[in-house]
């Protein structure tokens, strides 16, 4: 399985001048579209692609993903939807790959304890039938929730398998220095 990061760029991408100091002044350009994937499929037998469809996703990006038949990504930290009454819901399409989190966001324990406010934590705990004062149980239940979904495949980062807190976070986008240092030292615990 190959995960294509920034799949949206195959539909349209943000072009900037190579000499620009920031990416503010650019414009959208059409990407290669479905023709690129048709050529890939001619060259590679049993091509198995996951479209990373996170970020600015337009109807055109979704159409390209669907026309190609590729599953998209659903990250539970991002796709739990809180309504105005602070109730939570989620819908996971069958043609998707579900992640509890990715290398670019907090661990599930860290997400629950640091990234959500009290009403959101209460709503997630209620959804998972777990106690909000037990973040490791919340993590385990979210993993179970992922496996019970309609998704084609579930991917759980090792930090969530072990119910580790934010000290085990892999990467904080836009920062330097402390990223990519986490290592699994002992799987037995």
Where are these regions (language model features)?
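Catalytic cores of glycan-processing enzymes that make or break glycosidic bonds
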Residues: 1-189
């Amino acid at each position: 399985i190959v995960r294509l990061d920034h799949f949206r760029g195959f539909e349209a991408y943000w072009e900037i001048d190579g000499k620009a100091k920031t990416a503010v002044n650019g414009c959208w350009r059409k990407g290669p579209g479905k023709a690129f994937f048709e050529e890939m499929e001619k060259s590679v037998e049993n091509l198995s692609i996951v479209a990373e469809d996170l970020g600015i996703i337009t109807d055109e990006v979704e159409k390209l993903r669907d026309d190609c038949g590729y599953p998209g990504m659903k990250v539970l930290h991002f796709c739990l939807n809180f309504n105005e009454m602070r109730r939570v819901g989620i819908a996971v399409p069958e043609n998707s790959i579900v992640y509890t989190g990715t290398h670019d966001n907090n661990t599930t324990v860290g997400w629950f304890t640091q990234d959500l406010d009290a009403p959101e934590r209460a709503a997630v705990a209620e959804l998972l039938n777990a106690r909000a004062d037990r973040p490791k149980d919340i993590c385990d239940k979210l993993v179970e929730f992922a496996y019970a979904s309609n998704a084609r495949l579930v991917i759980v980062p090792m930090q969530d398998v072990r119910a580790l807190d934010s000290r085990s976070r892999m990467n904080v986008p836009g920062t330097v220095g402390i990223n990519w240092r986490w290592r699994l030292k002992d799987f037995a615990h």
